[in-house]
Amino acid sequence: MREGIFMSLEESEKRQEGYNKSLSSKIKKWINDSLTLGEMEARRLRHDPTELFTRAVQPVLWLLVFGETFTRIKAIPTGGVPYIAFMTPGILSQSVLFISIFYGLALIWDRDQGIIQKFLALPVPRSAFVVGRTMGAAVRGLSQTVIILLLALIIKVDIRWSIFSVLGTIFVVVLESAFFSCFSMILASLMRTRERFMGIGQVLTMPLFFASSAIYPISIMPKWLQVVAVINPLSYVVEILRSILITGVYENMLLHLGLLIVMILVAIIIATLLYPRLAS
């Protein structure tokens, strides 16, 4: 009887080992698939590097014109921080938002060219497609981050330069790119034409930007707009970046970071579920 029990235990252990190996191999395959797709997306940027500079024009104008002007006027309360320093994290977030939220346009283009259909025929998890796309968006977002921070250095914006601030900024920009590119993929899955997607994207970007703490504190907004700003993911991104780069006050940073990560996970799940609709 004992021998039978030992044999059952051994068989159970072998099955568990096989399951663990299978799970481990699946995870490794998923990571490799995601990285491969992310690399493919990054190559598109290498083939058209002028996109980096054309997209950098708007944030540069915001900092040089709007930022310098309102720093002199001193019309917006910033808690003793120079206005141009206050708005720099907001303009960085805006730039990443604008790049990421129109990322779904490339998906619609790929669908019209029949590329999405070919991808979906591959033995690759749908979530790997979504995560790979977010990696491509993150590369674009980080490239804009470099340009904006270099400009901030040139015009002598008072930024807290340190290893922590640089690594923290990279991490937050990747998170922002992930969320808004997933949001863009969700929109692309629901839109049938590029024109409709562009229209919806343009309608959403400006409210997301102005209904956040990017260029003014939430406290000076009307009450109804404060409610919108509190549930706006861009507000969390701006506040985290402002804590890291400008104020050094980390009181609510972990809360904002946690909420942002939860939003990203939900967005990835929804984008994964809707991704096959792109082929139809």
Predicted regions and their residues:
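Transmembrane helix boundary and interhelical loop/hinge segments in multi-pass membrane proteins
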Residues: 45, 100-124, 134, 280
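Junction motif at the cytosolic side of a transmembrane helix
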Residues: 4-15, 19, 245-248, 257-280
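Membrane-interfacial helix-loop-helix junctions in multi-pass membrane proteins
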Residues: 44, 75-78, 160, 209-266, ...
